[in-house]
Curated annotation (Swiss-Prot):
Residues 4-205 form the Glutamine amidotransferase type-1 domain. Keywords: ATP-binding, Glutamine amidotransferase, GMP biosynthesis, Ligase, Nucleotide-binding, Purine biosynthesis. This is GMP synthase [glutamine-hydrolyzing]. NCBIfam families: guaA_Cterm, guaA_Nterm, PRK00074.1. The gene is guaA. CDD domains: GATase1_GMP_Synthase (cd01742), GMP_synthase_C (cd01997). Gene3D superfamilies: 3.30.300.10, 3.40.50.880, HUPs. ATP binds at residues 233-239. The lineage of its organism: Bacteria, Pseudomonadati, Pseudomonadota, Betaproteobacteria, Burkholderiales. Pathway: Purine metabolism; GMP biosynthesis; GMP from XMP (L-Gln route): step 1/1. GO terms for molecular function: ATP binding; GMP synthase activity. GO terms for cellular component: cytosol. The keyword Nucleotide-binding applies. Transmembrane segments: none annotated. The active site is at 84 (nucleophile), 179, 181. It comes from Bordetella bronchiseptica (strain ATCC BAA-588 / NCTC 13252 / RB50) (Alcaligenes bronchisepticus).
Length: 530
């Protein structure tokens, strides 16, 4: 079993970032709700737990009814790191004082380190004229610790928060008022790595080659000689799940690839070539274009389109699954954020993680057991796994694509003609993004954008081509940059790149005579148009 760090979640929006930073240090971490009982904590320690991290929260530590840290956390003898609310709870429960702050801190702050603690010693972003090392951090709090608990010493301070960090190094307790897990805290990654390795004593035994070996062994033990069926969409999660399961059990896996006529250009061919031809995976390729297009005729409402596409997918998949009489397992590309959300860990009030996470909407009447080989991994780890399994990087690192496909990138009613025009326009846009490099970073603009695509607008505009008048459709280009997809900024693509994309689309895709670029951020707009 890998060395582990337990993260207790009290409802912070960035708790998952803590787990990701710990794993980036090569240490396995798990998130559990903050209201677990003492027995759970003691059991974790008995199984070799190396340390505990307490997350932030929107709640107030000193208000009645606020979630308390299990007492066992401070009794079992492993190092503990409290972050924001975690620091306040630690102080409150160990004899310190927490008060409402007259000067709330939200955003950047400059913190001075004190006391040469193991956590912060030697870390600094700049030095003051007086020689004090200073850290650039991200704060988000309305309460603050005003009196240290017995045994603690001051570890950090700001002008408006005299106790911005504290430590009881004899017991291995550390706490900071700022958020080391977010990228805005420059030394945050180093702090968390120092906590899990230098303070908790983790060696960093979490790596992808070992994970593959362990996952393959688990799948073989779980499945035995049974048959497995998987709905392959061509997306990252289902593709990596298929590659991993096939590595484990070979021809016991059958993938069902449903082409609803709303995929990207040549996507069906790429999936078949990658999995069937190159990797030898058994794939049932179902061309259900006519079925989907027929059901979408006359439907303009975005939500109605999504429901129709989802319902028809389930129907097609069910039909194909029924033909595979020996299948006893349904495999899904469920990943760790899905598991956390299904447990309600975002609220910090869930007590257990559900074992069944039916993200695909497939009915329980299939009577299949669930196989989720990626449920321990974050998205970036899934991509790393995909490359290690031999999947093409352009498949593993492709931008997100909605389940309904082009159905929600064609505004209004979906028609075969519209889908063909959009497919070709979108392919040109993506090709140019992949070919265009930003000289400052050396990266392509495809790598610099988090998501990019074309949108078909079912309106016509007047144009001139040669000596003739045209009256053809409009395409909008959308490219955004984001860390978490909760908020997003439109990408500042170079004008020559946009001009090249526009020229190619208008000249190569007959039926389109105007291209526009979407400069809306999220919020107020959403990333997708529908």
């Amino acid at each position: 079993m890998h060395q582990r760090i337990l993260i207790l979640d009290y409802g912070s929006q960035v708790t998952q970032l803590i787990a990701r930073r710990v794993r980036e240090a090569g240490v396995y971490s798990e998130i559990h709700a903050g209201d677990v009982d003492d027995a759970f904590v003691r059991d974790q320690v008995a199984q070799g737990l190396k340390g505990i991290i307490l997350s932030g929260s929107h709640a107030s530590a000193y208000e009645e009814g606020s979630m308390r840290v299990p007492a066992a956390v401070f009794e079992v003898g492993v190092p503990v790191l409290g972050i924001c609310y975690g620091m306040q709870s630690m102080a409150q429960q160990l004899g310190g004082t927490v008060s409402f702050s007259d000067h709330r801190e939200f955003g950047y702050a400059e913190v001075r380190a004190h006391g040469h603690t193991k956590l912060l010693d030697g870390l600094a972003d700049f030095t003051t004229d007086e020689g004090h090392g200073m850290l650039k951090v991200w704060m988000s709090h309305g309460d603050k610790v005003t009196e240290l608990p017995p045994g603690f010493k001051l570890m950090a301070s700001t002008a408006s928060c005299p106790i911005a960090g504290m430590a009881d190094e004899d017991r291995g307790f550390y706490a900071v008022q700022f958020h080391p897990e977010v990228t805005h805290t420059v030394q945050g990654k180093a702090m968390l790595a120092r906590f899990v390795k230098d303070i908790c004593g983790c060696e960093g035994d979490w790596n992808m080659p070992d994970y593959i070996s362990e996952a393959v062994a688990r799948i073989r033990e779980q499945v035995g000689s049974d048959e497995v069926i998987l709905g392959l969409s061509g997306g990252v999660d289902s593709s990596v799940a298929a590659a991993l399961i096939h590595r484990a059990i070979g021809d016991q896996l059958t993938c069902v690839f449903v082409d609803h006529g709303l995929l990207r250009l040549d996507e069906g061919k790429q999936v078949m070539q990658t999995f069937a031809e190159n990797m030898g995976v058994k794939i049932v390729h179902v061309d259900a274009t006519s079925q989907f297009m027929g059901k979408l005729t006359g439907v303009a409402d975005p939500e109605a389109k999504r429901k129709i596409i989802g319902r028809e997918f389930v129907e097609v998949f069910q039909d194909e699954a029924g033909k595979l009489q020996g299948a006893k397992w349904l495999a899904q590309g469920t990943i760790y954020p899905d598991v956390i959300e299904s447990a309600g860990a975002k609220t910090g009030k869930a007590t257990s993680i559900k074992s069944h996470h039916n993200v695909g909407g497939l009915p329980d009447t299939l009577n299949l057991q669930l196989l989720e080989p990626l449920r321990e991994l974050f998205k970036d780890e899934v991509r790393e796994l995909g490359v290690a399994l031999g999947l093409p990087p352009q498949m593993v690192y492709r931008h997100p694509f909605p389940g309904p496909g082009l159905g929600v990138r064609i505004l209004g009613e979906v028609k075969h003609e519209y889908a063909e025009l959009l497919r070709r326009a979108d392919a040109i846009f993506i090709e140019e993004l992949r070919n265009a490099k930003d000289p400052a970073s050396g990266l392509t603009w495809y790598e610099l954008t988090s998501q990019a695509f074309a949108v078909f607008l079912p309106v016509k505009s007047v144009g001139v081509m040669g000596d003739g008048r045209t009256y053809e459709y409009v395409v909008a280009l959308r490219a955004v940059q984001t860390f978490d997809f909760m908020t997003a900024d439109w990408a500042p693509l170079p004008h020559p790149l946009l001009a090249r994309v526009s020229s190619r689309i208008i000249n190569e895709v007959r039926g389109i005579n105007r291209v526009v670029y979407d400069v809306s951020s999220k919020p107020p707009a959403t990333i997708e148009w529908e």
